[in-house]
């Protein structure tokens, strides 16, 4: 296991650049001693914990005043890392925060690795692995709903569910041990078999129910992957720009001007819509455009939602019919663009629920948002306030494996296998669930997860 004997680390916890405040954070047993060497003000070793203290940062070698600061002094164990923490609040700016950080390092601190503060919180038992991952999700959340899921996970909703199941599995394993220790008692074996069957079915149902939230959780966390498709020059890029309320894609009358896949985010009902403006799908001899077309086809296959744009002022072409065919099994909304011009498209060959729009005149764009809302939110019941959602790919994969192990136990019971032979699968389920919370996670995984954090967190 990773050692719990830590040195004192330091890092800048605010974004680099100009700002009102910059924060240099220290964590470890020597935090107060290091800060006291460079801080002129109250004796930090004597101040009350969790207080802000006015003073100046001074280079002890030269006597140079670096900045006027407020120093937050927080004593263990009631801190984020459960170690002594010092937070030096400086005036924002690259130079001053860097110089103060270098002073702290010179006086005995070590530059923190990415995510090392949160890693220490995990290793010191302040948070488990799901809660540590929730910290990153809060930082990366693009909407309030994504943030709410992350906050709920940070609060321990997923941890509590997993830990309760693990405890129940341990209780069940204890009963199996009784069967192994006292095989001469047939009534004990029958009781144990009945308990194991009942409990494993209960565990499987709970985890399967949790897995059903994965699609909704992924949407709330990552957004609805939305491919805007159509033959060249039907208004795909104009639609993207309209939804974004800014010009991101090149808009011209020349077919093939979008040569690659453009991705941008827009909020619909508090959920991120990841808009993908694809290159027009058509046959072309242009090598660069061909690459864009292939990427467009890939985006179409992977999209949660497809916006198919057709030109209402022109008859359906072979390319239009091809797009209608290849997208018919997707979650699709058909948009008839350029309705400000005389309509010549054959609507009898289209589904009835098309939306007529004019991107140029900004007509009926709101109806697209209404349709998306109906597809994903109102009809699907996307958000339940008190529900626990799976949104992390690592969690989903592990719970799928846990369900498979439980199914193996249930199948063995159906075949009449003795419960003691099924102990291995039940124990494996307990171990897999422990990987989710970090109780049984390998050191390499922990290191890899925390390396994804930013410096200072």
Curated annotation (Swiss-Prot):
Biological process GO terms, please? tRNA methylation; tRNA wobble uridine modification
Provide the protein's localization: Cytoplasm
Cofactor stoichiometry and binding remark: Binds 1 potassium ion per subunit.
Cite the binding residues for GTP. 233-238, 252-258, 277-280
- UniProtKB keywords: Cytoplasm, GTP-binding, Hydrolase, Magnesium, Metal-binding, Nucleotide-binding, Potassium, tRNA processing
Family, similarity comment: Belongs to the TRAFAC class TrmE-Era-EngA-EngB-Septin-like GTPase superfamily. TrmE GTPase family.
Protein name from the UniProt record: tRNA modification GTPase MnmE
Source organism per UniProt: Streptococcus pneumoniae (strain Hungary19A-6)
Organism ancestry = Bacteria, Bacillati, Bacillota, Bacilli, Lactobacillales
The record's gene field reads mnmE
